[in-house]
Each structure stands twice: as C-alpha cells, then as structure tokens.
C-alpha cells in the first residue's frame, strides 16, 4: 500500500488489493442498510482512514471518483478540506486552538452544500480526532445529535488513535471499531507486494 495516496480511488484500490482488516467488510454491509456513527480507532498507520473510505464508498454513486477541495479562509489561515459526493474530511490536527469557530463555519458550509445538491445522506470523516480542542469537544455531541437537517442525514466517521479521551456521549452514540496491528507474517507479505 502506498503511504500517501493522492486521491480516494487510490486508497480504495490499495484496500482491494490487500485488505488486512477483511472482517470489517461484513460489518460495512450491515451498515449499508442502516448507517450509523462510527469510531475507528487503532495505532497510527493501521488503516483507519482507508477503512473509513471503504465504509463510505458503498454510499457513493461515483465510487468516490468525484473529488473536490473546499477552502475556508479566515484572518489568520487558510483551511483546505477534501470533499466527495458523499463526504467531507476534517483533520482536527490542522484546526488548532480556534477550532470551534472554524468548525462552525465548516458545518454551516456543509449544510449549504448538502442542501443545494439535494443530498439525502452525508458523512463527515473526522481525522486525528485525538487532537480535538477541548472547547469543541464539549459541544461536539450536539452536532452528532443533528441526524437530519433539511432532509439530509448526517453521520460521523471518527478516526482516532485512542478512545479513552472521547466524551462518553459521543462513544455511546457510535459503533466502536477497533483496528489492531496485523501479525508480522502479513506485514512482510504486504511489504513484499508494495511498490516503493
């Protein structure tokens, strides 16, 4: 698997070639009928982001081939977010200490995008959730409770290295999926098949 793929389909191609978390495929099929908030946790580099894309890809009409960048600029910084036909990605590592204001602006724009494009379902992938600022963390559950706005159902896919610091309300509202490091034999097999 290439470490930093440049688009969604490259991640999906890599997981279709070598999927070290095959047990999740059946679980994702169950979610197809009834999507739910999900927390995917495990050590860095284990494939949380790739598993997130695999999960939401079955809801995408374009199979995540549609990719755009969405930019928010404030007086200090410029923030770039990836957007597909079914999701947006927010990296909490890049939001910093002004994250609550940025989040409110992003969420407002998400509502506009989904309403204008008449989506019925939309996912928000929250990368590096372990870096969420305390002020935003305290109010984050209220966003998760907003399951439906303007006839659009919103679901959060949270990627984090650990769940111990996540608010109990967020954990209770989500399915928790734990990813573990594969055996050494599988890592060697993957290494031998991966072009560098």
Give the label of every model feature segment.
Residues 154, 167-185:
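A short helix-turn-beta junction within AAA+ P-loop NTPase domains corresponding to the substrate/partner-engaging
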Residues 28-32, 187-194:
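Alpha-helix C-terminal capping segments
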Residues 1-129, 138-139, 149-158, 168-170:
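P-loop/Walker A NTP-binding region and its immediately flanking N-terminal helices
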Residues 96-98, 184-187:
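A short acidic, often aromatic-flanked loop/helix-cap motif at beta-alpha or helix-coil junctions
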Residues 128-132, 163:
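Conserved Walker B
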Residues 173, 177, 189-196:
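Conserved AAA+ ATPase "sensor/coupling" helix adjacent to the nucleotide-binding pocket
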């Amino acid at each position: 698997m290439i470490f930093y793929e440049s688009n969604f389909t490259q991640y999906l191609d890599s997981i279709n070639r070598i999927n070290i978390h095959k047990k999740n495929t059946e679980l994702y099929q169950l979610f197809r009928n009834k999507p739910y908030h999900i927390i995917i946790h495990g050590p860095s580099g284990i494939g949380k982001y790739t598993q997130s894309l695999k999960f939401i890809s079955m809801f995408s009409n374009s199979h995540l081939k549609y990719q755009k960048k969405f930019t928010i600029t404030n007086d200090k910084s410029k923030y770039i977010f990836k957007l597909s036909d079914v999701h947006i990605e927010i990296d909490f590592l890049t939001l910093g200490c002004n994250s609550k204001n940025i989040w409110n602006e992003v969420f407002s724009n998400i509502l506009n995008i989904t309403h204008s494009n008449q989506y019925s379902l939309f996912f928000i992938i929250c990368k590096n959730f372990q870096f969420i600022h305390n002020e935003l963390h305290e109010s984050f559950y209220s966003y998760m409770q907003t399951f439906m706005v303007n006839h659009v159902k919103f679901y959060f896919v949270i990627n984090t290295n650990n769940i111990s610091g996540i608010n109990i309300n967020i954990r209770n509202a989500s399915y928790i999926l734990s990813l573990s490091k594969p055996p050494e034999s599988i890592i060697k097999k993957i290494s031998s098949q991966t072009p560098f």
